[in-house]
Amino acid sequence: MKKNPSGVFSKTPVSCMQETVLRQLVRIAGLHEMTIWRNRKHEWHLSVTVTQRSQVVYLSTRRAPRVPRAFTRLEAALAAGQRVSSTRQVTLVLR
């Protein structure tokens, strides 16, 4: 969060893309890293780093394309990641 001159906190801008657009970006630019992480509300989020960009891109919802999509189950987040990266086999690294 960033603090504005007026003293009010604002959320940092997040780069989000819908699944179809993100799939095309990964296909063209190449996948560097895909991360599934959990926040304090126990929601899972999917983020992708593309090889030609150093920016992290989050999977967005269909109805609100600028909001990161929150998954309630890890299996659903993994399935969405497999659809984005067009792979069947995924290696999990737990931290």
What is the meaning of each model-derived region?
Residues 37-66, 84-87, 95:
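Short aromatic-glycine-(Arg/Gly/Cys) micro-motifs in beta-strand/loop hairpins
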Residues 13, 67-68:
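Short N-terminal micro-motifs specific to bacterial/archaeal maturation
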Residues 26-29, 63, 78:
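Generic low-complexity, intrinsically disordered sequence content enriched
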